[in-house]
Amino acid sequence: IVTQSVKKLGQEIKDIVFNDSNYRLLSNDDAITLKEMRTFDKKDANNLSLYNDFAYKVIPANTAMDTGLYEEKVYKNGRTKKVKAKGTLHQYIIVTFSRKMMEYQRTIRERQLERAKKLLRLKDPEKIKKGPNDIRRFLKNTSSDTANYVLDMDKIHEEEKYDGFYAVATNLDDSAKDILAVAQNRYKIEDCFRIMKTNFDARPVFL
C-alpha cells in the first residue's frame, strides 16, 4: 500500500478520477457523486456525517514494470539479443474525496495567494523565483524583456481541481475501507522507524 499522487497519474486514470460515476460513501457504500459531495449544505445538522465522510472509487491500474531479469528476443532475421524482461504489476488505485479536506486545502491556498499578492507589490524580480511548493509558484512573468509579474490564474485553477482528493495504490484484494485504514495509520509506522533510527544502539559486532 503506497500513497499515489493524483497529479502524477496518467491522463486516462485522471479522467476516471474526475468522472462522477461509481463513487461510493466509505461509511456505508451508498452511491454518491462528486457534485453532491461538493455542494451539500454543511450547515444542515443532517449532513454532519456526510461532511465527515469520504467518497471513494476503486480503479484498476495495472502497469508494466522492470522485473530485473533478462530474456532472449528473437528478431525476424534470426538474430537474438538479451533484453530486459517486463512484467505486469496488477494493482488498484483507490481514490477518495473529502469535502472537509477540499475546504481545508482551499483555505491554505487563499492564505498563500494573499501572501503572493503582497510579494507582487514588491516588484522585485530577484524575490520572485518560483519554488515547487511555495507561494511563488502562483506567479508568472508576462513579459520577456521586463519584470511584469501577475497571478498565474491557470496554475491556480489547475491546482484547485485536485482539492479534496487522496489516493493510494495497492495490489492487495482487501476492501477499500481496510486498505485506507492501514494507509491512514502509516504515520505510526513511519514514527516507529524514525525512533528506531534515532535511538537504536547496538554493541560492536566482531566477525
Question: Which residues are covered by each model-predicted region?
Answer:
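Anion-binding and metal-coordination hotspots
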Residues: 1-207
